[in-house]
Amino acid sequence: AVSLYTMMDKLMLGAMSTNAQMGFYEASERIILCASSVITAFGTVMMPRMTKLFSDGDLRESQRYMKLSVDAIMAIAFAIALGIVSVSRLFAPIFWGEDFAPCAYILSALALSIPFSGFANVIRMQYLIPNGMDGAYILSVILGAVSNLTANSLLIPRCGALGAAVGTVIAEGVVCAAQCLAVKKRIDILAYLKSTAFFGMAGLLMYGAVRVLDQRAEITVSWLLLEIVVGGSVYCILYVLY
């Protein structure tokens, strides 16, 4: 699904915006794909195990694994997403150069799609596919594609690459919501959402701590590393307390 939306974004950017905007988007997209690959790998590893549990009718154990997976993936997803948002102002010009400073906004927007894609990954890889609910999965992807197409058509002409990034976030949100609705009568989605609220709050506190530093930070590697260490420390301490 992510590949579909990013491909759509690139095609529409090429047709409706400039080469510079395309470059900003592609650079930002690579970072997001790299950062979120651990979430994709987690889902791929867990799918055979969940398929075996469902085929054996072991619902209690499958629910336990899903709860553990949701907690683990969402802890990682919020740390990555809000961590990227926190340091993007320094990261973009340091990593790519001053000409790519606008990537900070695009990178931040794309990062917000990670929690949605992470939660949807658990539902898809550990419930929909193991239970043969391919139709619900395909429908969610179609709805996401339509949402992305609509959002891009409205936003890219006005906002360029940032508009495409926002369209991707909207699409991932729609996919996540559609998959949750597909399984709401079978599993307690609300309980999973409540358990992830803590990680969202921890991520926001991490973001707040880094933003305090960022107000006086210079665009140097040392300041970037300091922000990463402070943000990571705040998040890890809160996670341990949880």
Residue positions per predicted region:
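A helix-boundary/kink motif common to multi-pass secondary transporters
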Residues: 17-18, 55, 96, 133, ...
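Helix-capping/transition residues at the boundaries of transmembrane alpha-helices
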Residues: 14, 51, 128-129, 156, ...
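Transmembrane alpha-helical segments of multi-pass transport proteins
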Residues: 144-147, 194-242
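Signature of the first transmembrane helix
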Residues: 1-19
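Membrane-embedded alpha-helical segments of multi-pass transporters/permeases
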Residues: 11, 15, 38-41, 81-89, ...
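Specific pore-lining/lateral-gate transmembrane helices of multi-pass inner-membrane transport
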Residues: 24-142
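Short runs within selected transmembrane alpha-helices of multi-pass transporters and secretion channels
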Residues: 2, 6, 40-44, 105-132, ...
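Alpha-helical transmembrane segments and their helix-entry boundary regions
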Residues: 10, 22, 136-138, 164-165, ...
